[in-house]
Curated annotation (Swiss-Prot):
Component of the ribosome, a large ribonucleoprotein complex responsible for the synthesis of proteins in the cell. The small ribosomal subunit (SSU) binds messenger RNAs (mRNAs) and translates the encoded message by selecting cognate aminoacyl-transfer RNA (tRNA) molecules. The large subunit (LSU) contains the ribosomal catalytic site termed the peptidyl transferase center (PTC), which catalyzes the formation of peptide bonds, thereby polymerizing the amino acids delivered by tRNAs into a polypeptide chain. NCBIfam families: PRK04219.1 (NF003258). There are 2 genes for uL5 in S.pombe. GO terms for molecular function: RNA binding; rRNA binding; structural constituent of ribosome. PANTHER family: 60S RIBOSOMAL PROTEIN L11-RELATED. It comes from Schizosaccharomyces pombe (strain 972 / ATCC 24843) (Fission yeast). This is Large ribosomal subunit protein uL5A. The lineage of its organism: Eukaryota, Fungi, Dikarya, Ascomycota, Taphrinomycotina. It holds the Pfam family Ribosomal_L5. The keyword Transcription does not apply. Belongs to the universal ribosomal protein uL5 family. Keywords: Cytoplasm, Nucleus, Ribonucleoprotein, Ribosomal protein, RNA-binding, rRNA-binding. The gene is rpl1101.
Length: 174
């Protein structure tokens, strides 16, 4: 007997990929980090500001200390593929959140295939992947907002299985 057909509304997909470079300082290094994100994504990055002053770190409130860019669609999948190649398709179980999203970091952006430029330098970055299913929009839309049912919500186990199957990857840990 043939295997039971999978419900197309239950299929997982990548909602968005957020690339983040957090330096903890503003100035020239931050603008160079923004150039790296622009080269990688083809989009203009947004700067994040410090929420409050921390004198020990030399950070003032509202000072720009990081930059990030949100990528969606096929471009997000292509950039994620390059990031996972750097990690050799190996993530730890603790990289996956209870809500089914996952994230990881890389040490050097040149591992992604970007040519090294001495005027820019080398930056590490974080990849955050937000997963969703068809029908999840009912919880986010403005009009006629609804709730996503318990059986339709995404958990870590769903995402880990999707990750292993799609990328033929390894998840380490218990």
């Amino acid at each position: 007997m043939a295997e039971k057909a999978q419900n197309p509304m239950k299929e997982l997909r990548i909602s968005k990929l957020v690339l983040n470079i957090s330096l903890g300082e503003s100035g020239d290094r931050l603008t160079r980090a923004a150039k790296v994100l622009e080269q990688l994504s083809g989009q203009t990055p947004v700067f994040s500001k410090a929420r409050y002053t921390i004198r020990r770190f030399g950070i003032r409130r509202n000072e720009k200390i990081a930059c990030h860019v949100t990528v969606r669609g096929p471009k997000a999948e292509e950039i994620l593929e390059r990031g996972l190649k750097v990690k050799e398709y190996e993530l730890k179980k603790r990289n996956f959140s209870a809500t089914g999203n996952f994230g990881f970091g890389i040490q050097e952006h040149i591992d992604l295939g970007i040519k090294y430029d001495p005027s820019i330098g080398i930056y590490g970055m974080d990849f955050y992947v937000v997963m969703d299913r068809p029908g999840m929009r009912v919880a986010r839309r403005k009009a006629q907002r609804g709730r996503v049912g318990y059986t339709h919500k995404i958990n870590a186990e769903d995402t880990i299985n999707w990750f292993k199957q799609k990328y033929d990857a390894v998840v380490l840990g218990k």
